């Protein structure tokens, strides 16, 4: 079952951490998250799953940055989130989707116990200008039933910024 906005609010500071938190960003069953002012792009046209892929940082100026179609941009939320009782999920806002802007390519599902900033896999279908601090996506929470272990040792846990793919670590096992 998805938590209502009122239930999210009741759990803030205990089972759900969102920092910084602004009550005005609560929706009927989600909370809006905003875009940080930096993006990462991969430097190479061909990416290799088995090796770290070099990236470069792009700053989003206050007057906006024009994104190009066919290019993957990695961003992150301004908000740090943590959950100990609910499964977090991330979705783009309908307003961004209607502009042809995808906020996550495949990674909208979080694990119970995840703590960190959300890395956004941003892709657009036509050129679009984006701005820092825009409310770009929303987080919502599911109940979990049955026994579970908290996510605590994943490669993206407690991240401090934008996380490029660390899939190469899966090959090191």
UniProtKB/Swiss-Prot annotation:
Q: Does the keyword Cell wall biogenesis/degradation apply?
A: no
Q: Which SUPFAM superfamilies is this protein grouped with?
A: dUTPase-like (SSF51283)
Residue sites binding dCTP per the record:
93-98, 111, 119-121, 138, 151
Among InterPro entries, the record links this protein to:
dCTP_deaminase, dUTPase-like_sf, dUTPase_trimeric
Q: Where is this site: Important for bifunctional activity?
A: 108-109
State the family named in the UniProt similarity comment for this chain: Belongs to the dCTP deaminase family.
Q: What is this protein called?
A: dCTP deaminase, dUMP-forming
Organism of this sequence: Clostridium beijerinckii (strain ATCC 51743 / NCIMB 8052)
